[in-house]
Amino acid sequence: MNSKHSYVELKDKVIVPGWPTLMLEIDFVGGTSRNQFLNIPFLSVKEPLQLPREKKLTDYFTIDVEPAGHSLVNIYFQIDDFLLLTLNSLSVYKDPIRKYMFLRLNKDQSKHAINAAFNVFSYRLRNIGVGPLGPDIRSSGP
């Protein structure tokens, strides 16, 4: 990728068992299949993400789904300064979010994006709570 910016990979270590999770949900449309979607754990947080009502996530967060080989796909994203500060303040893991980042999809996830010809219909960050053992898991540590 020939880019003006350096994209940093968002690693799995930002997901901490026993804490609420922000889930990146991507709906694809087009290609050889209909209604392809992905749910990707994005970030463990101390409290739910709340954005101002008058704004949409797309005002703060832009994604681009691109091939990273013959059968693998990366999701690139650019994060507005407001959302960047908000996510880093909510994150369980200290300051993991940068303005320009990407996620590597595994083969199964990549297959969905490829079948939809990388055509993103919509995306969102959804707050997911912890299960009944979350507090116990959190106190015992990973």
From Swiss-Prot:
It comes from the Viruses. Disulfide bonds: none annotated. The gene is M. Homooligomer. Forms homotetramers. Interacts with phosphoprotein P. Binds to ssRNA. Plays a crucial role in virion assembly and budding. This is Matrix protein. One of its GO terms (molecular function) is RNA binding. Pfam families: Matrix_Borna. It is a peripheral membrane protein. GO terms for cellular component: host cell cytoplasm; host cell nucleus; host cell plasma membrane; membrane; virion component. It comes from Borna disease virus (strain V) (BDV). It is found in: Virion; Host cytoplasm; Host cell membrane; Host nucleus.
